[in-house]
Amino acid sequence: MKKLFLLIAAACVSLTAVADEGMWMLPYLQKMNIRDMKARGCKLSAEDIYSINKSSLKDAVVIFGGGCTGEIVSPDGLLFTNHHCGYGSIQSLSSVEHDYLKNGFWAMSRQEEIPAPGLKVRFIRSISDVTADILGNVPSTAGQQEYERITSENIASLTASLQEANPGMVVEVKPFFEGNQYFAFVIEVYTDVRLVGTPPTSIGKFGGDTDNWMWPRHTGDFSVFRVYAGQDNRPADYSPENRPYKAEKFLKISLDGYKEGDFAMIMGFPGSTQRYMTSYEIDDMLNVSNPNRIFIRGERQAILKEDMAASDKVRIQYASKYATSSNYWKNSIGKSRGILKLGVKERKQQQEAAFQAWAEKNTLPEEGYIDALPKIREAIEGLAGIDDHRQYLEEAFLRAVEILTPAKMFDGRTEIKYPEEARKAMAGWYKDYNAPTDRKVAKRMLKIAREHMTDLPSFYTEIVDKEFNGDTDAY
């Protein structure tokens, strides 16, 4: 469910009213939410927010890049998003000579707007509930493998059918609520996106890691881009002949401000939620996954930070990588503190005890409710050691040591079939790679993995110990 689904959260922010903290699927606004929204002060109809027959707010709220939310704010494709969302593209366009990260950038004309290769903006053209198509022929007794086989076949078949009916679009069928509901998204993807303006990092990332994930924020966290299209206003690869996208709908920004009690809502692309975790999963998060992530990323970030401070070139090369790593490093720190402070695990245990009491009183053993929680607990506890080692392999090696990345990016078949594309991709990767920095990181990761993992990868015993007498630095 990662960041690809248009949902809406609405809240009345009056001090005398309680916020309705929900995530609501747009196709169900008319049926489920709009009456309550209007009672709280919303002046829009459900069709003003989501419609497949006319332009609506869904046409102004877009997926920016890998999954951020952006909003179209002019009839000529001007787009606002967060600074941290545009950060990767801003970094990619920066150099020591043109240091947009440090100094910011503002195009004084459309001719000065800078193309951002690889950046995409996706417009959701329709959302439909396809649960019956995906789950209709899945037996209620299906095991996990059978369930995955049947649903995968159904998704492939439905995707192909919808793709044929929507030429020029991208179709994605995604599960919600752990596979209990499925939605199909028809998406139009624009690939000519240009940087219009960004504040310097001193504003866009003001407060750095200290300010991140905190409230209230003090950061000027914004950047400005523009979507370009072909002469027919459809998606087109970059060309000087392209023109600004003519928006079907754009957000009109009021300069009148707001007052207490005004209706407010958020529309966009949130990530997946963890609020349905059991107490056993929360315990694993507190004692395994979060501490591992905080420690391993903290060790790597210290090395990156030192090298970035010593060289403008390295600072630019690693700015986006550092920001990506530190984002969920800080998130893990805050999440653990919040769970402990708010007693989340204890509240979950109370809910589970109430559920267990209800199940034992009101259901039969063969219905599966009575032993549901014990089975979940057994599975989570059985995976604890495996997850610990898996996370070290992922965080300390696959994420941290960059020289391993090309092996994941390419294989012989790709390079033979698409040699020019492979060369371009490799050149782009090397542009932001500094071998001395990566070597320092690799040395540290090899050491901490040996210190913390009880079951090490075989190369430790077969190569590091035999050929280098256990010296990970020499290896």
Question: Where would I find each of the regions flagged by the language model?
Answer:
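Terminal presequence/propeptide segments associated with secretion/organelle targeting
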Residues: K2, I8, L15-Y475
